[in-house]
Amino acid sequence: MLGTYFYHEIIRKTIISFGTLFNNINIKHKKSDGTILDDIKVGLSYGPQQKYLAKIQEQANLTKAVAITLPRMSFEMNSIQYDPSRKTGVTQTFKAADGTKMKKVYMPVPYNIGFELSIFSKLNDDALQIIEQIMPYFQPSFTLTVDLVSAIGEKRDIPVVLDNISFQDDYEGKIGRAHV
């Protein structure tokens, strides 16, 4: 219907690039004198927040084998929105070399891809340590350079904008039950 098949994995590469931002986050547990007890790498995976909350809540019996360790982060793509403010002419093209010949390439269509990053922790201080390691890089955006279309060598600087941070703590439930 629309034309010739193509798949440059642009959305996939964008998702991977977003996740890579949060790969190397650690937290530390310290004694009151400042001595480090634990240096913990925070796990990261792609998937919806509700999936991880359900898994964590299934672990009510603490003697069971560990299925998810906390703290942990998950992220997911939650929207794709057209951005008319970045629109260029429909027929505008640019030339790109693929090593042997020049190719005529149409301008990309501007879309904003929304993500949600969720942080799960047993201790409030763990969550605050994670947030404090993320916030300074976003003022309010952080720019990633992504190799979007390898066939033509198209690399783009993609700004990742931190819109807001919201907190959710489940205070409901039985006394003695772990809260996430």
For the regions a language model picked out, list residue spans one by one:
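Short, well-ordered alpha-helical segments
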Residues: 13, 17, 126-137
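Oligomerization/assembly interface segments of phage tail-like spikes and tubes
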Residues: 71-79, 107-123, 132-134, 176-179
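Small/polar-rich, solvent-exposed N-terminal microdomains that initiate assembly or binding
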Residues: 1-92
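Short, charged/polar micro-motifs that form catalytic or ligand-binding hotspots
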Residues: 1-8, 116-125
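Short, solvent-exposed secondary-structure capping/transition elements
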Residues: 83-86, 124-131, 143-147
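Active-site-proximal segments of catalytic enzyme domains
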Residues: 87-90, 95-105, 110
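Catalytic micro-motifs at enzyme active sites that drive phosphoryl/nucleotidyl and oxygen chemistry
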Residues: 60-65, 99-107, 169-174
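Acidic-leaning, charged glycine-interspersed low-complexity segments
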Residues: 107-109, 129, 136-179
